[in-house]
A protein has these predicted regions:
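N-terminal targeting signals for export/organelle localization
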Residues: 1-16, 179-180
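Short, small/polar residue-rich loop motifs at catalytic or cofactor-binding pockets
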Residues: 12-14, 36, 134-136
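Hydrophobic beta-strand positions
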Residues: 18-19, 141
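Thiol-based oxidoreductase modules, predominantly thioredoxin-like and allied folds used
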Residues: 68-83, 99-111
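Short, internal strand/loop/helix patches
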Residues: 88-136
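Thiol-/selenol-based redox modules, centered on thioredoxin-like
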Residues: 127-180
Length: 180
């Protein structure tokens, strides 16, 4: 087409969601309108990989603490255990600003569907034939149009450095391209 920019990359879009945050308030994707966000899946009683990933996410949180267009969104994969008090305690342990780093819980089937269809993470059958989200260390960078723009190893300091750089690049693109 003449005179129109054409993109050669197709990004997967994250579907709408609505869950309960660590403050007890309802939180939906609508509240991320105009925001870049980093998503991950975890559970509060996980002592291994989840703590490593959350510690690295705390670096991202601190790097963008004053940036109004960046959020972190952590979805529990164990909503039966991770209710509002547990999410609040967990978020407090990382000194998370609840307006910037949102921890979410909700019905397990909805969280599993969001992980599997929304973020394209594998859901595997666990003992007892119940579908469980296989925990992954990936962090997903999602742009203002809700497109997944990158996947990062949440246990790697080097990958977190790359994530921070790519968030800054994305924000710079918005300032340049969209006259923000």
């Amino acid at each position: 087409m003449q005179g129109q920019w054409q993109f050669d990359t197709l990004y997967h879009k994250v579907p709408p969601f609505s869950f309960t945050s660590q403050t007890g308030a309802s939180f939906s994707q609508k509240e991320l309108q105009g925001k870049v966000f980093v998503a991950n899946f975890f559970y509060t009683s996980c002592q291994g990989i989840c703590k490593q990933v959350s510690t690295q996410l705390a670096r991202v949180h601190d790097a963008f603490r004053l940036q109004p267009d960046v959020r972190l969104v952590s979805f529990t994969v164990n909503p039966e255990q991770d209710q509002v008090p547990q999410l609040k305690e967990y978020s407090d342990s990382f000194r998370a600003d609840p307006s910037r780093w949102i921890f979410l819980t909700g019905p397990k089937p909805q969280i599993q569907a969001l992980a599997a269809q929304g973020f394209k993470l594998p859901v595997v059958a666990a003992a007892g034939d119940s579908a469980e989200l296989e925990l992954h260390k990936q962090l997903m960078l999602v742009d203002k149009q809700k497109r997944i723009r990158g996947i990062y190893d949440g246990t790697s300091a080097k990958e977190i450095d790359r994530l921070i750089t790519e968030i800054n690049v994305l924000l710079s693109e918005y300032e340049t391209d969209h006259g923000k």
